[in-house]
Amino acid sequence: MNIPKIPLAQTVILQCKKHGISHVIISPGSRNAPLTIGFSNDPFFKCYSIVDERCAAFFALGIAQQIRKPVAVVCTSGSALLNYFPAVSEAFYSKIPLVVLSADRPEHLIDIGDGQTINQQNVYSNHVVYNANLKLDIREESKLHELNIFNNPENKVVCFLSKQKEIDAYNKNEISIALNECILQSAPVHINIPFDEPLYETIASYNITISEDTDLTNSYCISDINNIDEAMVEWNNSGCKMIVLGVLHPDVIDNSLLASFANDPSVIVFTETTSNVHHPNFFPCIDKIIAPLESIEFKELKPDILLTFGGMVVSKKIKAFLRKYQPKKHWHCGFPNAYDTYFKLEKHFKVKPNEFLEYATKRKLFHSKSDYRKVWLNIRNHRRKYHKQYMDEIPFSDLKVFDQVLKRIPDNTHLQVGNSSAVRYVQLFEINPTLEVFCNRGTSGIDGSTSTAIGASLATSKNTLLITGDLSFFYDSNALWNNYTPNSFRIIVINNNGGGIFRILPGNKNTENFDTFFETKHELNASNLCDMYNFGYQCATNQKQLIDALDSFFNKSKNPKLLEIMTPSTLNDEILLSYFDFIK
């Protein structure tokens, strides 16, 4: 087995192995050659080669999102690591463990006009939980003159060994801290690694050792379950309680536990598509339920206590509702932090959701006099009735497409949804509860949805479908440039010839140069990209073509497939806005 000769490279590789980091995504370069050689020649690691660093980082994020363990990305020096930044910020806000291993030039070559060189240390400062800036090895006789000692050869050797030992200890400690923080906080870290030339020398086996001890004492997960008792007194005394679920993995909350806790006429549970929680007594499709409400209804329906679980919430309407008509108290349950999204955060229970629910259910009292849930149920049932009627009546459009597509997704599919309008349309429908749904809601960018979905498809046993818009798809089209996309992978692109969401936002259509600078109209289609990357391609421009295409789209195939659905950009916004009027 070829091992990089450079001790620092060996240290990084062995520390990753020690911490169980087995997935490594490598982008080509020379300065990172010691890491590339080491990772790719060690059978412990599953290595992927992705040229575009932005795609590589989102690809890694998709894997980490599914395995819920750190995944490493490796790049060369210079601007390469800046291309990781969108995925790093997404990982930071979505609490996904990502390890950035950036190769760097020696410190004496920084800011002197050397090529492919920038200030790499702490470059992600506000979006990682740890920065490890490693020290360059002193490993050559030619470097001995740099040591601050007398010109006695014996002293030079002693000083060399002592100095290198000191550097080794520092580097091992910094790497260990970074990887531990990545695991414990489920968040990104940056390890910057300076290498001097020569970069490609190898040896037959590792000549450094790493201690087996791994200190993973998690100070972030100290349960404060005893603090729930006091809160439950307030909970039981309140007649209007609302639970809102944000982004959650499918197995984080036990549906039956939550249903038992919420089995009370004074409690309602709002879920989002990305909550991955389903129960007949819960309230999915938040926007559908609350968007048509009038001010007087909002005042009457505001909760006394808001309890939240999970990560980011997609619905802008629930955020607007609870910020204007604020609850008296907002409590959040979960690790590691709580966002004051509604400006009323009072308590943060650092407890696993199921642990909280199991403990709190035993202490809750049935609030028989409240009609809070009954009022909401009447609203929900009314919306459902008119939603179905509207779907039956509307012509071919974005909304109609989502209605037809979501009905036909096979059971147990892993569904990735693009940002902007795609995820908002999906939120209007009560989807098949066997689906697992994910979306990059940490920063809500359109830039890496396809790369994330492809990465995720390699880390799940389920068939993966990505539903995305045209701008998001074309923006991240380099995601298709890889050798790993499984034949079962499917993409549905809703192409409305631009950023359709800007037609929905108030006022923008009347802005000068709206088509060019907001909607960014285009006449592109995905057929040539599919030819280039060996995807099966289908296109639908009306409902009959769509239904015919969907009949075979999910069948087994020798290649991944893409279905492009062309919708009328000038009708989509009118149909959606009329929808909220119709279901009132």
Task: Please report, for each region that a protein language model flagged, where it lies by residue.
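N-terminal cofactor/phosphate-binding cores enriched in small/glycine residues
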Residues: 4-91
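Active-site diphosphate/adenylate-binding microenvironment
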Residues: 9-13, 20, 27-31, 35-36, ...
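Phosphate/pyrophosphate-binding active-site segments
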Residues: 1-4, 141-158, 162, 320-421, ...
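Glycine-rich, anion-gripping cofactor-binding loops and their flanking helix/strand elements
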Residues: 83, 245-331, 432-461, 474-478, ...
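A short, small-residue-rich loop immediately preceding and capping a beta-strand
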Residues: 22-25, 46-48, 66-105, 302-310, ...
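Conformationally flexible catalytic loops at phosphate/diphosphate-handling active centers
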Residues: 3, 149-165, 172-177, 181-237
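Thiamine diphosphate
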Residues: 101, 108-130, 140-147, 425-584
